[in-house]
Amino acid sequence: MRVLHVCSELFPLLKTGGLADVIGALPAAQLAEGADVRIILPAFPDLRRGIPETVLVREIDTFAGRVALRYGHYRGIGIYLIDAPALYDRAGSPYHDASLYAYSDNYQRFALLGWMACELACGLDGYWRPEVVHAHDWHAGLTCAYLAARGRPARSVFTVHNLAYQGLFSAHHLSELQLPAEFFQIYGLEFYGQISYLKAGLFFADHVTTVSPTYAKEITQPAFGYGMEGLLQALAHQGRLTGILNGVDSDIWDPQSDTLLPTRYDAENLQAKAINKTHLQTAMGLQLTESKPIFAVVSRLTAQKGLDLVLEALPELLALGGQLVVLGSGDTTLQEAFLAAAAEHSGQVGVQIGYHEAFSHRIIAGSDVILVPSRFEPCGLTQLYGLKYGTLPLVRHTGGLADTVVDCALENLADGSASGFVFNECEAQALVKAIRRAFVLWSRPKHWRHVQRHAMRLDFGWQLAAVDYLSLYRRL
């Protein structure tokens, strides 16, 4: 089966979020299952540098001018790069400028991504033509609209990684993008008077997936649907909405082989994890002690991630004898609040603003608990990394967090299924109660190690998701 993934990021060459991790792992897992998989992306500078050897497939005229399609390989996967320097040859983020303003021509930049994916489905590359086109998030949403406009030359799947980002643009761009005028309606890509690239993917795809079963249910409700819940309810009723859990790339995230760690370890050698803890405490200026559990945040610092709750719960966490480590960037108010906490609680709170992939590995390996108190979380990868590294996740019961972490309630401890700590209400007091339960388990080292070992043996590998996606493709 020939499958084309359409997206805007690829780990490790270009990453702004979890989407890149998915595209860096899922196609390879599908290839291992026997599929013929390729990826199409805009030729952003980081991607051009990472895939320097490419050949010209075709040059064609598009609504955005003359565009070249190039082809190369990265880690055994075929990669198409859309070579349009005027649109894509910009340093930094693929979405916004240095002042964090979204590029004014994003409507054109990401429409071209969908256009070129559709052209491949129509035979642009004489040597390879996809049977299934799999588009990811709003950046690739128009792919499904262009395929519909061209008579559906391939089956299409659209995956929502985060419904909050909807790709909204002015309606007057419709004719410029060469989309049929009749597509601009409620039963189409119109959303409150604008074009929504996300809605285009949802409406015109043959099948829609999300990145966890629970999130697939949540987004049919007004609280999580961002105005799309009616359409999503209809898709669910038609059997065209499925939740498939993301996985962990064990080539990158595995404490047994992770070269970014001071010391590698596994479930049978947890003493070595303590060495990582000492290194982390030193790096973050924390008091050197094995007796205090380290709670960690590795996240975008936003309200969605529930990090205001962490700030509210921090006095109790410290009073109970814990330490806190934070790595991330985002909302200025949250950044300043965490930095102030680090200054006030020197030796017990360490904060690093920004994101460093290598350091994130060392934090997850060196911590005892990873905090993911999200208000909503389509899947979440951080808690999966925590499980893999024996760093018990403390999460809110939402989205993929609900699907992957089993609370350390007495009955779950008794049957051996417990893997972390789960709270329900999106309130600081609920988080505090979960933190207290973490300290209760921490006070029983034998039980803590038992839960750690169980968590580390859980299988959230990409092969499971790869098989589920391939099975879905065959049903289309």
UniProtKB/Swiss-Prot annotation:
GO cellular component terms attached to this protein's record: cytosol
Enzyme Commission no: 2.4.1.21
Pathway assignment: Glycan biosynthesis; glycogen biosynthesis
Superkingdom to which the source organism belongs: Bacteria
Catalytic activity: [(1->4)-alpha-D-glucosyl](n) + ADP-alpha-D-glucose = [(1->4)-alpha-D-glucosyl](n+1) + ADP + H(+)
InterPro entries, sorted: Glyco_trans_1, GS/SS, Starch_synth_cat_dom
Record's protein name: Glycogen synthase
Gene, per the UniProt record: glgA
